[in-house]
Amino acid sequence: MRKIVSIVLILIAITAIIIYYPRDEERSMTPGASVDEALDSIIQKKLAMIDERGLDLCVSGKSLSSFGYDVRLDDKAKLLAPEDFLEDIMCCSVNEYPNGKIELDRSETELQFSSGDIQNIDDKKYVPISDHLAELGYDVTYDLVRGKVDFLNNDGGKYLPKAYDMREHDRVTPVRNQGVYGTCWAFASLGALESISLPMEENIYSVDHMSMNNGFSLDLSEGGEHTMSLAYLASWEGPVYEADDEYGDGETDPDLTAVKHLKEAIIIDNEEQDKIKSAIFKYGGIETSLYMEMSYGDFESEYYNKDTCSYYYDGEEKPNHDLVVVGWDDDYPKENFTPEPSCNGAYICKNSWGEEFGDKGYFYVSYADANICKKSIVYTKLTEPDNYDNIYQSDILGWVGQMGFDKDEAYFANVYTAESDEVLKAVSFYATGPNTNFSVYVVTDYEDMSSLNGGRRQIGKGETRYAGYYTVDITQDIELKKGQKYAIIVSVKTPGSERPIAIECDGGDRTANLDLTDGEGYVSLYGEVWYSAEESDTNVCLKAFTDDK
């Protein structure tokens, strides 16, 4: 409900001042209701002011101003919500189709919006939600004078359905076959990555290219894991299309360039079931691991029920196989498993052993499995490759280890030299744990390590809900001249961590290609006394992105 808390019209005459207060009906207007001409004029002026300075967006009274969600009001004061707000805050599954249709799912509610319903503002799509707030589990209060909107959840946050299958929403790519190679990790990573663009866009990415161009010194038989995939994607090595580098021939083209750029990925630890389901529902398939007591071509195991395509392992072996979780069923009968777990419920998983395995390549894994979803990754933001012109980095191998000062806070910095006249557009880094608060700074006139103290300027801040890889866009223009040295600094506070800085470092044989000569990084506890990262045989995981002038 819209409340106009104070409208004061002051008319100055020769001897009198007349003050006008809003009528009761003006205080209790409903958004979109008809109004008289004078009141409508007042509202339009308020809406114009809000459009210029932005809406103060709150959830249960807490401001979201630091998160950058661009919710808008149309000329009837009805809410227009972008995809990131619908997913992150309202906990909807947002599916966009090639014909322009958008489907919103929340709990058991499914809403369809045609292309004519959607507003496109500054190349961003907005969904009109005012008429559907009750169906989506929210009440909203309005304060147009202050330009404030407060969302109040009224369904207890119960937004997940009891069962969800991405196959039923056109959100999976075809099942593939890894054959005899140890490339399940790459199939799982790319299967998860492919799903986040569906149903709008179907792409099949090259497993060979990821497996053979990731910077790590492992061959196709030695396996891998999600940090390798993340490093490959974050460093713009890929992805590339399968058609340009086909699987299984043992050859690759290292000169291919990425057809998409990864901006964000989140990591969920410790099988937090609601968070796993939420990530699948809102973003797409998740890459995770389990122990498979069978291998490709041999689908016999005491833990696998062929008749029901279900798997449950209750032993102590560590994970040895990666796959993609694409859904769940809370009521999946425990009797379908061999042996029988203590509870109903299963994740729906996409494997990489071809369609002859399971139910055309899919199978059910019990919630009670010893390893499933103990660590999971979901790719949440993928853009076209022209989002930035240039990348500056010294951590091709990405997050190999962590360092810090036995405290949950730290500063870290990287120094770069502009290769041409450019504009700084964004920075990226890893949050090594959930609920990380961060601030981003720049030093544009870097001379030596002392510059990290005196000349830094804050250019961003925020908080991450999950561990993961994050890109922070910079809203102000920071111009760099060719040959100019500049430093990016990030401060983090990661609750419960003693080493909150992600670093590239020696990780054994797989990191034999580690290069510590390509960076100039520094670390500090409070941002006052700095230490060289390279002198500790590490590179700081902190990238910068620029556009050419």
Residue map of PLM features:
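N-terminal Sec-pathway targeting helices
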Residues: 1-11, 20
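Primary recognition of N-terminal secretory signal peptides and signal-anchoring hydrophobic helices
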Residues: 19-160
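Catalytic-core signature of thiol
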Residues: 21-22, 26, 155-425, 430-466, ...
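Extracytoplasmic/surface-exposed domains of secreted proteins
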Residues: 85-86, 131-134, 427, 486-492
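Short beta-strand-to-coil "C-cap" segments at the C-terminal boundary of structured domains/repeats
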Residues: 107, 150-155, 381-383, 445, ...
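Surface-exposed coil/turn segments at beta-strand junctions on protein surfaces, enriched
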Residues: 120-122, 133, 281, 342, ...
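Aromatic- and Gly/Pro-enriched, solvent-exposed loop/edge beta-strand patches characteristic
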Residues: 435-516
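Short, surface-exposed beta-strand/loop patches at domain edges
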Residues: 491-549
